[in-house]
Amino acid sequence: MVEILYQRSGYPYLVPLCIACDFDGTITTVDTAELTLRKFAAGKWEKYDVLLAEGRISLEECMIEQFKLIKAPKEEIIRMLDSAIGLRPGISEFVEFCRNKNIEFTILSAGLDFYIDHIIAKYGWNSVTRVSGTTNMTDGITVEFPKHRFSDSKTFKEDFVKIQKEMKKDVWYFGDGTSDREGALAADMVFTVAGSRLSEIMDAKGKIHRDFQDFVEVLTVLKNSLA
């Protein structure tokens, strides 16, 4: 496991590094969950996004209600997404560097687990782990999200970050949207997709963060941190 060298009171100390990365709109260039909803949802799914933004429902509650509205087989969803989305430049090289350096890389996503697994297998990201909801294709898509270990966690993403920090790890969080807010606020270092809603939220909260366009520039930052 790679450790990051810090200075505190003039003395160096090492902290294990964990990469926590959102999927939709961060690894991918478009939000696959939103695209799936626009294509296949049988109902007014947008109202749940409004309720989430207003803080009236949780992230998990939002996705549970939205996924219920999706009326399409898994194979059709995968075919549609494969034809419509791209990956953010440099992500495969970033994942490979993390693998070679034994840096933990975890995808945190409120999106479709089966499509994330499809991408992981397609690109051979065998070292990547996924923390997300577990879907079941019934009448619509039902989803069960990880239980929170910490009672004050607002989302499973925040809970994951807290667990890593409890294990004395340094967490670098990558994201783009409202669903990443709590996880990013709990992280040690935050990378936000340039021009994204998460970037605006971090500015409003006074949380130091670094905007990025692609993972090529992020890889340079990581390499410099390990130099």
Q: Where do the protein language model's features map onto the residues?
A:
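Structural recognition of alpha->loop->beta junctions
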Residues: 120-135, 186-188, 200-202
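Active-site neighborhood of HAD-like aspartate-dependent phosphohydrolases
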Residues: 2-64, 68
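Substrate-recognition element of Asp-dependent hydrolases with the DxDx(T/V) motif
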Residues: 91-121, 129-134
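Conserved Lys-Pro-Asp/Glu-containing loop-to-beta segment of HAD-superfamily phosphomonoesterases
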Residues: 152-179
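Acidic, Mg2+-coordinating phosphoryl-transfer loop and its flanking beta/alpha structural elements
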Residues: 109-110, 169-206
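Metal-dependent phosphoesterase signature
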Residues: 57-93, 101-103
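Histidine/lysine/aspartate-rich catalytic loop segments that bind and position anionic ligands
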Residues: 125-151
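Short acidic-hydrophobic, aromatic-tinged amphipathic segments that line or gate anion-handling sites
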Residues: 131, 191-193, 208-217
